[in-house]
A protein has these predicted regions:
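Transmembrane alpha-helical interface segments in multi-pass membrane proteins
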Residues: 293, 300, 304-347, 380
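Mechanotransmission and gating elements of multispan inner-membrane complexes involved in transport
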Residues: 172-273
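A structural signal for hydrophobic secondary-structure junctions
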Residues: 64, 74-215
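Alpha-helical transmembrane segments
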Residues: 31-59, 343-346, 350
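Short helix-loop junctions at transmembrane helix boundaries
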Residues: 334-380
Length: 412
């Protein structure tokens, strides 16, 4: 250890109480940043995975402009060709086909406009959580033809129960009248009010017959094995689709294009969180600034003596910066270790938010949240603390360079 480092280490502990308080403030800020960033990233991942498992999937293959217009004529014409491509991509965990249309649905008492989704029961169970959301009755099977699943809120609005029949009336792909009668086999509840109020699911084969789809579908829904692989999968699928030479090229959309509202909510929450973190770091920076300004005032005479016997201002500045960075690094390392341990505990056991379950359900989140510790969440916050505290310590350290030895030694 150099002489300057030894001097800095001894100077740090001249006022033990002040040093410990400063280190604790830095450690607490680092701990809080590690945990809160991990909690934010974990909640975002939960929101994304919950939403894609209920509605969109991580990726979808669609006809161009179908996402904007929802025109029943804009179809994926030969889905089995797409299936052959998807089976060759190892990062794809599962996929399924869906048909989408709007219709009027009537019970004996009421009529509502709903979104009708045709699903492949076997594949859908691997792609979405719909099967686990059934609260009454059973999920669809491959043998079902005229059965349907409806949301709990829709069932309440229509005043129907299991076994009741519903009349579905819409327009087919060829412009013909699409009409059928289905029997309620299951009632689901996702916790997302808009979805539970206006969704009905029927077997894909029935959907294709009723809506004159001629074997076509509207969506090929893909689930990736990890959120990290979505961009790579999207690129692979787009490259493979370009080789099909379709007259009307298909589009590959990822989750943030399919759910722009969710993406915007995450971005807004992240920005508000960053503002809070910045304020926290600034508080710590002012604490460091205050500590070193007080140290300079208390040690002005000492600095004057050192400069009088030949110590250069640059060396004094170096010693002061070593002092500040040593305290900062002790606090940051302590904060990262403790914050990571706390985060890992809650990453396994979760945090109970059952008291706010009704609010969280609007975002498709259950009453228990799990932080997600990563290198980004563990390092980015403390790194910001390090940079800003260095800048805060730079001012008092440079202030020493302007001291005049004679005047400094007269200070009492």
């Amino acid at each position: 250890m150099s002489i300057d480092a030894k001097m800095a280490w001894r100077n740090i502990w001249r006022n033990t109480r002040r040093t410990i308080l400063t280190i604790c403030a830095i450690a607490f800020a680092s701990l809080l940043l590690v945990f809160m960033l991990s909690f934010q990233f974990g909640s975002y991942e939960t929101m994304i995975n919950t939403s894609v498992k209920i509605q969109t999937g991580h990726l979808q293959i669609q006809a161009q402009e179908f996402q904007e217009k929802k025109n029943i004529r804009q179809v994926v014409p030969e889905p089995e060709k797409i299936a052959a491509i998807l089976k060759t991509i190892p990062s794809i965990a599962a996929f399924t086909f869906r048909g989408q249309a709007f219709a009027l649905i009537s019970s004996n008492e009421r009529t509502y406009g709903v979104a009708v989704t045709g699903i492949d029961p076997d594949r859908e169970a691997d792609v979405s959580r719909l099967k686990s959301l059934i609260r009454e009755g059973d999920f669809l099977t491959a043998e079902d033809t005229d059965q349907a699943l409806i949301g709990r809120l829709l069932a309440q609005n229509l005043r129907v129960k299991l076994g009741d029949e519903l009349t579905v009336l819409g327009q087919g792909r060829d412009g013909s009248i699409a009409a059928t009668v289905v029997q309620i086999k299951g009632i689901f509840s996702s916790g997302i009010s808009d979805f539970d109020r206006a969704a009905i699911h029927i077997p894909l084969k029935t959907f294709q017959e009723v809506y004159s789809m001629q074997g076509a579908v509207h969506e090929v829904v893909v689930i990736a094995d990890s959120l990290r692989n979505i961009n790579a999968i999207k690129t692979s699928v787009e490259t493979a689709l370009s080789s099909l030479n379709e007259k009307k090229p298909l589009m590959v959309l990822d989750w943030d294009e399919l759910m722009p509202g969710l993406r915007q909510s995450i971005e807004m929450d992240l920005i508000s969180g960053l503002i809070f973190y910045l304020l926290l770091v600034l508080v710590v920076a002012f604490s460091i600034l205050n500590t070193f300004l007080m140290a300079i005032f208390e040690r002005t005479r000492e600095f004057g003596v050192l400069m009088a016997i030949g110590t250069t201002p640059g060396r004094l500045t170096k010693v002061l910066l070593i002092e500040s960075m040593t305290m900062t690094l002790i606090g940051i390392v302590t904060g990262i270790i403790v914050g990571s341990l706390i985060t890992l505990y809650f990453q396994v056991h979760g945090i109970d938010f059952s008291g706010a379950s009704e609010l969280l359900s609007q975002f498709g989140i259950t009453g228990r949240m799990y932080p997600k510790l990563s290198w980004l969440s563990a390092i980015s916050g403390p790194l910001a603390v390090l940079m800003i505290t260095f800048l805060a310590a730079l001012y008092p350290a440079l202030k020493v360079r302007r001291l005049q030895p004679v005047e400094a030694m007269r200070t009492t």
